[in-house]
From Swiss-Prot:
Organism: Musicola paradisiaca (strain Ech703) (Dickeya paradisiaca)
UniProt-listed Pfam families: FtsJ, RlmM_FDX, RLMM_N
Keyword Chloroplast: no
Disulfide bonds: none
The protein, known as: Ribosomal RNA large subunit methyltransferase M
Length: 366
């Protein structure tokens, strides 16, 4: 198997392809991409056979911005016989994967492929049994073992491969299944909830998303992102010239500042979270987020960058580079990750966590 498949948002195949080509090249792994517009996936075919496995081991999945999932795969299996679709799939995995911990029969995130979902659910049961009988799959699901993926792109046509459980998306199809809360002011609330799932390990939620923390939401109205913070019993400074949802104001946890989010400065020293979903040029948002982090006005930040029509990967990479440079110049050690989330559209979500500062005495360290 010399190919790597990356699932992505339909319409962002070129960005996903540019990113994997760039980041594979930095590891001296070379190949070519196969891209079909609006297909929801990209194939990176390595020149060296063993490089596909090496790439999915060595390239941290969380460093990929536009990929929802990453797996090694072989050639496309075409025209699987309806009377026996299982044998060719088992044959492709034999000698390649042993004692995998999970099976996922998936489809790309397109309207055409979603019509295959019902078939995938039914097909999973007999395929799982066959893989267990051949010792390709363990008798019980094991979260620390490789995952077998079967990706159907059309009836009777699928890619078969595997991913590593310590370097992939834990979600089926790479998509967290979140339910829209009926009392939330806007659907944008799901962006921040998904960001928490993607960027913050579940066993750290109590520590980093805890009750009683102070947060600032820039460009808050009507309160979709503020809702997530309030739900976690935080005290929130909501900054926006517009009106906040009355249901949030009634909680007593929200202070509404009718001000420009780009000029607002925190009124207190113990702000932990900064969140921002303002419609503005990426460079302007990045610069202001850097101000907050360098000045020690917050510990962690989650913000969205709205993407231009062209050279979207290049634009994101440039802004992340500028942010990294600003933090380094300010003596800040930080973790920076970006991801185009399922609930994002023409945008990506960035998470920054300050680890420590080389310069003592900042506001958040007193």
């Amino acid at each position: 198997m010399n190919k790597v498949i990356l699932y992505c948002r339909p319409g962002f195949e070129k960005e996903c392809a540019a990113e994997i080509t760039d980041k594979a090249g930095r590891r001296d792994i070379y190949g070519f991409v196969r891209v079909k517009d609006n297909s929801g996936y990209v194939i990176f075919e390595c020149y060296q056979h063993e490089d596909a496995d090496r790439l999915v081991r060595e390239l941290p999945f969380r460093d990929l911005i536009f990929a929802r999932q990453m797996m090694v795969c072989g050639e496309l299996l075409r025209d699987l016989p309806p009377e026996d679709r299982i044998t060719p799939i088992v044959g492709m995995l034999t000698g390649v994967v042993e004692r995998a911990g999970e099976l996922r029969v998936e489809v790309p995130d397109t309207n055409e492929c979603k019509e295959l979902m019902k078939f995938c659910r039914k097909f999973t049961v007999p395929l799982r049994t066959a893989l267990r009988n051949d010792k390709i799959l363990q008798a019980q699901e094991k979260p620390n073992r490789p995952v077998v993926h079967v990706l159907f792109i059309a009836p009777g046509c699928c890619y078969v491969g595997y991913s590593y459980s310590n370097n992939h998306s834990p979600f089926y199809m790479g998509i967290p299944r979140l339910k829209f809360p009926s009392d939330a002011p806007s659907r944008s609330t799901l962006k921040l909830e998904e960001a928490f799932h993607v960027f913050i390990p579940a066993d750290e939620w109590d520590e980093r998303l805890g009750s009683g923390m102070y947060a600032v939401d820039l460009g808050a109205c009507p309160g979709g992102w503020t809702y997530q913070l309030v739900k976690r019993s935080m005290m929130v400074h909501a900054v926006d010239n517009g009106m906040m949802a009355q249901s949030l104001m009634d909680t007593g946890q929200v202070i509404h500042h009718q001000a420009d989010g780009f000029r607002f400065e925190p009124p207190r020293n113990n702000i932990y979270w900064l969140v921002c979903d303002m419609v503005e040029k990426p460079a302007k948002v990045t610069s202001r987020m850097a101000d907050w982090l360098v000045n020690g006005w917050c510990r962690e930040a989650i913000f969205n960058l709205k993407l231009p029509m062209k050279k979207r990967y290049e634009e994101v990479a440039l802004n992340l580079e500028k942010l990294t440079q600003r933090l380094q110049e300010g003596g800040i050690n930080a973790e920076i990750h970006a991801k185009q989330l399922y609930h994002d559209r023409e945008e990506v979500t960035v998470h920054v966590r300050r680890i420590w500062s080389a310069i003592p005495g900042r506001r958040d360290e007193r």
